[in-house]
């Protein structure tokens, strides 16, 4: 007889937003940000109920197609135990379709919440490596997912063997002098829509340029933040995406003219700025506010947290 999770178990997870690429580190570098979603699960005898508060309420599906639900089912299959029924409550603060890793956070949060359930019933929770692998299988690349799992800054990579892709990541010790800012516009953009703007092939010169900058960025993030301007230069994806988000592209250039190491956050249209100054230049703040950007001082986000029982916010 197949074992199932008993009814009445409650678990929760809190997961951070993330910024991928950071300029040159396309699909490999990521940074968790101090903006969080919370997921609360409860097992029931049957059925599925999905409740969404905050970002996405009234817009995302409230059935088995919901990304968090799909991640939960993926995690339960990986552990090897089903649930006969679920109540899934999502409290979302991470903006959708802005380049802040909301989909990766949804997947990582759903998988982590599974750990809170199965740990109460005698099953071994998913490890960090399993969380990275399972969540990256949804995304197709591990940069956002790994940042959401591990917290802080990460370098991630893929090893392929035939049709299989193995996803891995290591965490970097972010230099304490680095200050983070997000600039989030009201407009939205989808990663799929902007990826079609990227060429299938790039020149050796462009590849060499980005390789050097991505390598330098690891040093800048951990040891030499004075190198952030040079280390965040990119020729592989940000110039190509500029036409799809002209306001973000213009603001990006303005920030960089003021010696702020700004990049697109993921596929945009949000921007992330890394600087050793505790404040952005007044001209940059004024321009952002006048052009529909919400500017927020951030810190590096924490690793995903899960626990059995009541919600973190209770």
Swiss-Prot record:
GO CC, any one term: cytoplasm
Gene Ontology terms, MF aspect: ATP binding; homoserine kinase activity
Protein's pathway: Amino-acid biosynthesis; L-threonine biosynthesis; L-threonine from L-aspartate: step 4/5
PROSITE patterns, alphabetized: GHMP_KINASES_ATP (PS00627)
Keywords: Amino-acid biosynthesis, ATP-binding, Cytoplasm, Kinase, Nucleotide-binding, Threonine biosynthesis, Transferase
Cellular localisation: Cytoplasm
Name the record gives this protein: Homoserine kinase
Lineage: Bacteria, Bacillati, Actinomycetota, Actinomycetes, Mycobacteriales
């Amino acid at each position: 007889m197949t074992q199932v999770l008993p009814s009445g178990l409650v678990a929760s997870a809190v997961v951070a937003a993330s910024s991928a690429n950071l300029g040159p580190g396309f699909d490999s570098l990521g940074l968790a940000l101090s903006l969080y979603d919370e997921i609360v699960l409860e097992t029931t005898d049957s059925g599925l109920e999905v409740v969404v508060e905050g970002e996405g309420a009234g817009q995302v599906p409230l059935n088995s197609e919901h990304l968090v639900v799909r991640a939960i089912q993926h995690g339960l299959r990986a552990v090897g135990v089903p649930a006969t029924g679920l109540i899934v409550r999502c409290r979302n603060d991470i903006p959708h379709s802005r380049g802040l890793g909301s989909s990766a956070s949804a997947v990582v949060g759903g998988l982590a919440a599974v750990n809170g359930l199965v740990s109460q019933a005698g099953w071994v929770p998913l490890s960090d490596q399993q969380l990275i692998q399972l969540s990256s299988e949804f995304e197709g690349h591990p940069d956002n997912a790994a940042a959401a799992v591990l917290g802080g800054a990460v370098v991630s990579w893929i090893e392929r063997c035939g049709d299989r892709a193995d996803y891995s990541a290591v965490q970097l010790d972010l230099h304490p002098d680095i200050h983070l800012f997000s600039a989030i516009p009201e407009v939205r953009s989808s990663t799929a829509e902007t990826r079609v703007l990227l060429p299938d092939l790039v020149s050796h010169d462009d590849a060499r340029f980005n390789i050097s900058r991505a390598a330098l960025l690891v040093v800048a993030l951990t040891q030499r933040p004075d190198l952030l301007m040079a280390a965040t230069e990119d020729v592989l994806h940000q110039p190509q995406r500029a036409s799809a988000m002209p306001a973000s592209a213009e603001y990006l250039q303005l920030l960089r003219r003021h010696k702020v190491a700004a990049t697109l956050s993921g596929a945009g249209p949000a921007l992330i700025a890394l600087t050793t100054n505790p404040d952005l230049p007044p001209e940059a703040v004024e321009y952002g506010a006048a052009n529909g950007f919400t500017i927020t001082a951030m810190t590096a986000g924490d690793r995903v947290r899960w626990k059995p029982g009541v919600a973190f916010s209770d």
